[in-house]
Amino acid sequence: MQVVNVATLPGIVRASYAMPDVHWGYGFPIGGVAATDVDNDGVVSPGGVGFDISCGVRLLVGEGLDREELQPRLPAVMDRLDRAIPRGVGTAGVWRLPDRNTLQEVLTGGARFAVEQGHGVALDLERCEDGGVMTGADAAKISDRALQRGLGQIGSLGSGNHFLEVQAVDRVYDPVAAAPMGLAEGTVCVMIHTGSRGLGHQICTDHVRQMEQAMGRYGIAVPDRQLACVPVHSPDGQAYLAAMAAAANYGRANRQLLTEATRRVFADATGTPLDLLYDVSHNLAKIETHPIDGQLRSVCVHRKGATRSLPPHHHELPAELAAVGQPVLIPGTMGTASYVLAGVTGNPAFFSTAHGAGRVLSRHQAARHTSGEAIRASLAKRGIIVRGTSRRDIAEEKPEAYKDVDEVIEASHQSGLARKVARLVPLGCVKG
């Protein structure tokens, strides 16, 4: 029903799309994609982005570090990561911002500002969506409450399904694409999944309320109040997009800071540098140009729980990846595989694909009959080390709470949304 409701939004073009990992969400389904024609009454809807604005994934690749080489040191590495990575609801981050002026630099500069402050290298930005910074951000469109929530959380995982996972490449499907990505069987990687924390949540909350009140002024009626929306070109629409871009930059800076904390752990424990393969959001609305009915049109592409998947030779790709397409990072669960895919030509859903396994059990249902300690012990028997803030958090994220990620990936591959490059298996997980 949510996919159908999205199809009624003013200005929608082509279709309302559901990705293979689709499940129920706020307004839009999680795993939903829709584009609206911004010059023909197209709207923007915060429900099409979600509360965790710019929640996304980045993958770090261990330069010359093999799974067998890491194995004896893995417990020590996980203990160090456990201490180095802040997480949990309301947790303070690794970077203590001195004042709101510095926060505003983060909101407008994203990962680029973090790198300029010494938290990374210039090459990192070449491997980030939009070069690590989304233009159009305006902190003046953000409430004091949202700013206050963002001030102390930069550089932290948060809670829920967010994580930092040490992985190893288990299988390579496409050696030609895997080579420039630095992926070979046995290669150690680190996947980071988090977003814009309390700041993004508050921005969504604030602008949903504003749009609920504003829709009448624009003559808009929606079948579900959670689909509150306004025209992209309206003052309300521009205010949301400016605030959303600021949250996107916060999320990108957040992952950049966690990257540096992780690099320090690996440098100290293994002497191995970690190179950034790619960083991409899966909760975002972006103004893009796409062919619609034979003409190039400016559209607002909502991707909620959906990963951008650019094809080979797209102008936004770094030169060394242009021939193979954008790396698409799709995490599984604590006990299952994650995947690296690549974008393909002809993707019908505005170059979008899945973002994860997709929930089948609510958090309450997942935790009802299982203890976090039992899950931790079960994973330990399989050689997977788990570090979590609470037993309930671990129970809520048990593998059985999600769809079979292998089936989600196969559906993405077979339907022409992306192609398989490599399969990664978990070695250790720091849970948010």
UniProtKB/Swiss-Prot annotation:
GMP binds at residues 161-165, 282-283, 331-334, 338, 355-358, 431. One of its GO terms (molecular function) is metal ion binding. The keyword GTP-binding applies. GO terms for biological process: RNA processing; RNA repair. Keywords: GTP-binding, Ligase, Manganese, Metal-binding, Nucleotide-binding, RNA repair. Induction: A member of the dormancy regulon. Induced in response to reduced oxygen tension (hypoxia) and low levels of nitric oxide (NO). The active site is at 355 (gmp-histidine intermediate). Its EC number is 6.5.1.8. InterPro entries: RtcB, RtcB-like_sf. Its cofactor is Mn(2+). Mn(2+) 1 binds at residues 52, 55, 162. Mn(2+) 2 binds at residues 55, 193, 282. GTP-dependent RNA ligase that is involved in RNA repair. Joins RNA with 2',3'-cyclic-phosphate or 3'-phosphate ends to RNA with 5'-hydroxy ends. Ligation proceeds through 3 nucleotidyl transfer steps, with 2',3'-cyclic phosphate termini being hydrolyzed to 3'-P termini in a step that precedes 3'-P activation with GMP. In the first nucleotidyl transfer step, RtcB reacts with GTP to form a covalent RtcB-histidine-GMP intermediate with release of PPi; in the second step, the GMP moiety is transferred to the RNA 3'-P; in the third step, the 5'-OH from the opposite RNA strand attacks the activated 3'-P to form a 3',5'-phosphodiester bond and release GMP. Monomer. This is RNA-splicing ligase RtcB.
